[in-house]
């Protein structure tokens, strides 16, 4: 399938060493090694990329109990923006994307750029860069335009707001 030597961390987006180290320690304490191991297993299985979200649910051993008829409530056509809280981290994102992908293939997930390293979902991710560099600002403007294009084409945008890090006082386009 793809190279499993991806940078499996969010620490690279932090500009100062203290922040980087804090994130690395937090990742190690909250299951990063287990997630990396599951991802490496997934790569060895060489599964079709379109099944990534469903395969992830199996690998993570998630027992998904959809609320009422959640899949049936997803419109099959037309513009759609899905905004969801993600109190359970990766499990929430995997679950939402799995449900959406059962109905639609014209979806894009706006998320941290580090997640775009997963080859199976690279084309489904619109990356955000949370650093304060000029390159990050230009990249994020490009991502915003990409999201607008998806919606203008009657596609689906999925996003998980992250509070303070998802806001910027002013961005010039």
Each model region followed by its residue ranges:
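Soluble catalytic domains of membrane acyltransferases
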Residues: 63-173
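Membrane-anchoring hydrophobic helices of lipid-metabolizing enzymes
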Residues: 1-83, 93-95, 102-104, 122-123
